[in-house]
From Swiss-Prot:
Residues 499-600 are annotated as: 3 X approximate tandem repeats. This is Extensin. The keyword Repeat applies. Residues 229-242 are annotated as: 2 X 7 AA tandem repeats of T-H-R-H-A-P-P. The gene is HRGPNT3. It is found in: Secreted, Primary cell wall. Residues 205-620 are annotated as: Contains the Ser-Pro(4) repeats. Residues 1-20 form the signal peptide.
Length: 620
C-alpha cells in the first residue's frame, strides 16, 4: 500500500515536485560538496560493476536489516538529496531516495530526457525500490533512456533479489555505493533542477512531514552509520565521477555532505524501508496542501458571498431604509405601510378623511364614520368642492351629505387614532400624495406632527384640489397657517371677510354656540348635543392625539373651508366673527402653543354648544 502511495506520490512529485526540488536543492547543495566525489569519478566504471552489487544491495535495503548497508546505497543516492534531507533527514530521504534513483536514471538522460521523460518512468521506479533504482542506475547508467525501463526490471530484480540482499555482502554494499555514484550522476539532475524548480515548493512542504517519520531510521543509523559512513565516503568519490559528467562542480560539493550526512543518511535507509510509510504520509500532505489552498480561497468566498450577497443586499436594503428614513417622519406611516393592506379598509376613510378635514375635525370625525359611504362620494365632490369651496354654496350641498354621515362618525375617533396609520395610508391612497407626504411630513413633524394625520387626509384632497388651492390659496394659508402662522394671519382676515359674506348667516350667528358648530356640523345631528360634550372628551383624546389640536386648528381652517359650506349650513363664519378675536387666537393656534389653547376654546364653546345643539337637534 505504501509503495502504491509512494508510487502515486513519486509519480506526481517526481515529475516535478520531488525530482525538481531534490535536484535543485541537492544540486545546489552538491555544488558545495560533490568536489570530492568528483575525484572518485573513475568509479563510474565501478558503477557498471556496482549495478549488480547495487541490485543486491538495494534489495537488501528493502528486503532486510541490510538497512545499514542499504543505508550506504541510500546514502549514495540520498547524499545528493542530502542537501535537502539534512533538514529533513527522515522524510525527504525516501523521496530523495526515489529522486536520487531518478537522478541515477536521469543522469544519462537527465541532460535531455531527465526532466520530461524521467518523471514518468520515475513515478513507477522510485516507488518500486529506492535501492532498486540504485542498482538499476548502476546498470543503466550506460543507457540513460534504458535506465528508465531497466529500472523497472531492476526493481523487480531487487525484489527477487531480496535473497540476494543476503548476498548484499559488504562488498556489494560498497558496490551499492558505487551505484550511488550512479546517483552522483544525478548531477544531470541539475538539468532537473530547472524543472524541479517548478514544483519544488510543493514537494518541499510535503517532505518535512516525511522527514519526521524517517526519524525512526535513527536506529538503523546505529548500525549503518559506521559502515555507511565509510562506504559513503568512497561511494561519494565514485559518485563524483558521475557528477562530473553532468555537472561536476555542483555535484562535487554534495559528496562531502554525503560523507557527513551518510551517518544521517544511514537512518534514511531504514527510512527508505519506511519511506513507503512516509510517502503515504507524504502523499496526504501534498493533497492536503493543495486542497488547503483552494479551501481557504473557497471558504473566504462563501463567507464573502454569504456576507457580501447579504451584505450587498443589506446595503441595498440599507438604501431603502434611507428611503424609508424620509418616511421616518412618517414613523407612523412605516407601520402603516404594513397596515396598508388594512389601509384598504381605511382607504375609504382616507377619502373620507380628505373630506373630514373640511367638515371640522373634532366632532365631525366621529360622525364621519358613516360618511365613509357618503363621504366616498364627497371625496369626489370634495375634490371639486375645493374649487367650489369658494363657491361656498355648492360645498354646502356636498357637505350636507357629510353632515348626515357625520352623525355616525363616532367610530372614526378610533379611526382618528388610526389616523397615523391613515396618514401612511393617505400616501398610498394618493399616489401623488405619496411624494408630498415626505415633504409634508417634514413640516408636520415640527408643528404638524399632530395635524399630519388629519392633515394628511386633507392633503390628499388637497392634492386633488391643487387647482382649487389656487382659489383656495387664502385657505391654504389658513391650512398651512399652523406652520406659517404669518400667512395664517391673513387667512383670519379673510375669514373675517368671509363672515361678512356670511353676514346672511348672522342668523346662524345665533349658532354662535355652534362655533363648535363646525363640530356640531356633524355632531349636531347625532353627535351633537350630548355627544358634542362627550365628543369633546373624545377630542381630548384627540388632543392626546396631538392631531386634535391641529384639528382645532383645522377647524379654524376648516371654518375657512366650512365657511363656504357653512354659509348654507354652518354659521361657523359668524362664530368666526365672534371668534374674530379668536382668529388671532387661531393665528396663535397655528403656533402650536395655541394648540393647547384651541382645545380649551372649543371646550368653552362646547358648553354653549350643548344647549344650542339640543335646540338645533330639536329643530331638525
Amino acid at each position: 500500500m505504501k509503495l502504491s502511495t509512494l508510487f502515486a506520490l513519486v509519480l506526481l512529485l517526481q515529475s516535478t515536485a520531488i525530482l525538481s526540488l531534490v535536484a535543485a536543492e541537492a544540486t545546489t547543495q552538491y555544488g558545495g560538496y560533490l568536489p570530492p566525489p568528483v575525484t572518485s569519478q573513475p568509479p563510474p566504471s565501478s558503477i557498471g560493476l556496482s549495478p549488480p552489487s547495487a541490485p543486491t544491495t538495494t534489495p537488501p535495503s528493502r528486503g532486510h536489516v541490510p538497512s545499514p548497508r542499504h543505508a550506504p546505497p541510500r546514502h549514495a543516492y540520498p547524499p545528493p538529496s542530502h542537501g535537502h534531507l539534512p533538514p529533513s533527514v527522515g522524510g525527504p530521504p525516501p523521496h530523495r531516495g526515489h529522486l536520487p534513483p531518478s537522478r541515477g536514471f536521469n543522469p544519462p538522460p537527465s541532460p535531455v530526457i531527465s526532466p520530461s521523460h524521467p518523471p514518468p518512468s520515475y513515478g513507477a521506479p522510485p516507488p518500486s525500490h529506492g535501492p532498486g533504482h540504485l542498482p538499476s542506475h548502476g546498470q543503466r547508467p550506460p543507457s540513460p533512456s534504458h535506465g528508465h525501463a531497466p529500472p523497472s526490471g531492476g526493481h523487480t530484480p531487487p525484489r527477487g533479489q531480496h535473497p540476494p540482499s543476503h548476498r548484499r555482502p559488504s562488498p556489494p554494499s560498497r558496490h551499492g555505493h558505487p551505484p550511488p555514484p550512479t546517483y552522483a550522476q544525478p548531477p544531470p539532475t541539475p538539468i532537473y533542477s530547472p524543472s524541479p524548480q517548478v514544483q519544488p515548493p510543493p514537494t518541499y512542504s510535503p517532505p518535512p512531514p516525511t522527514h519526521v517519520q524517517p526519524t525512526p531510521s535513527p536506529p538503523s543509523r546505529g548500525h549503518q552509520p559506521q559502515p555507511p559512513t565509510h562506504r559513503h565516503a568512497p561511494p561519494t568519490h565514485r559518485h563524483a565521477p558521475p557528477t562530473h559528467q553532468p555537472s561536476p562542480l555542483r555535484h562535487l560539493p554534495p559528496s562531502p555532505r554525503r560523507q557527513p550526512q551518510p551517518p544521517t543518511y544511514s537512518p534514511p535507509p531504514p527510512a527508505y524501508a519506511q519511506s513507503p510509510q512516509p510517502s503515504p504520509t507524504y502523499s496526504p500532505p501534498p493533497p492536503t496542501y493543495s486542497p488547503p489552498p483552494p479551501s481557504p480561497i473557497y471558504s473566504p468566498p462563501p463567507p464573502a458571498y454569504s456576507p457580501s450577497p447579504p451584505p450587498t443586499p443589506t446595503p441595498t436594503f440599507s438604501p431603502p431604509p434611507p428611503a424609508y428614513s424620509p418616511p421616518p417622519t412618517y414613523s407612523p406611516p412605516p407601520p402603516t405601510y404594513l397596515p396598508l393592506p388594512s389601509s384598504p379598509i381605511y382607504s375609504p376613510p382616507p377619502p373620507v378623511y380628505s373630506p373630514p378635514p373640511p367638515p371640522s375635525y373634532s366632532p365631525p370625525p366621529p360622525t364621519y364614520l358613516p360618511p365613509p359611504p357618503p363621504s366616498s362620494p364627497p371625496p369626489p365632490s370634495f375634490s371639486p368642492p375645493p374649487p367650489t369651496y369658494e363657491q361656498s354654496p355648492p360645498p354646502p350641498p356636498a357637505y350636507s351629505p357629510p353632515l348626515p354621515a357625520p352623525p355616525t362618525y363616532s367610530p372614526p375617533p378610533p379611526t382618528y387614532s388610526p389616523p397615523p396609520p391613515t396618514y401612511a395610508q393617505p400616501p398610498p391612497l394618493p399616489p401623488t400624495y405619496s411624494p408630498p407626504p415626505p415633504a409634508y411630513s417634514p413640516p408636520p413633524p415640527p408643528t404638524y406632527s399632530p395635524p399630519p394625520p388629519t392633515y394628511s387626509p386633507p392633503p390628499p384632497a388637497y392634492a386633488q384640489p391643487p387647482p382649487p388651492p389656487p382659489t383656495y390659496s387664502p385657505p391654504p394659508p389658513a391650512y398651512s397657517p399652523p406652520p406659517p402662522s404669518p400667512i395664517y394671519s391673513p387667512p383670519p382676515p379673510q375669514v373675517q371677510p368671509l363672515p361678512p359674506t356670511f353676514s346672511p348667516p348672522p342668523p346662524r350667528r345665533i349658532h354662535l354656540p355652534p362655533p363648535p358648530h363646525r363640530q356640531p356640523r356633524p355632531p349636531t345631528p347625532t353627535y351633537g348635543q350630548p355627544p358634542s360634550p362627550p365628543t369633546f372628551s373624545p377630542p381630548p383624546p384627540r388632543q392626546i392625539h396631538s392631531p386634535p389640536p391641529p384639528h382645532w386648528q383645522p377647524r379654524t381652517p376648516t371654518p375657512t373651508y366650512g365657511q363656504p359650506p357653512s354659509p348654507p349650513t354652518f354659521s361657523a363664519p359668524p362664530p368666526r366673527q365672534i371668534h374674530s378675536p379668536p382668529p388671532p387666537h387661531r393665528q396663535p393656534r397655528p403656533p402650536t402653543p395655541t394648540y393647547g389653547q384651541p382645545p380649551s376654546p372649543p371646550t368653552t364653546y362646547s358648553p354653549p354648544s350643548p344647549p344650542p345643539y339640543g335646540l338645533l337637534l330639536s329643530t331638525p
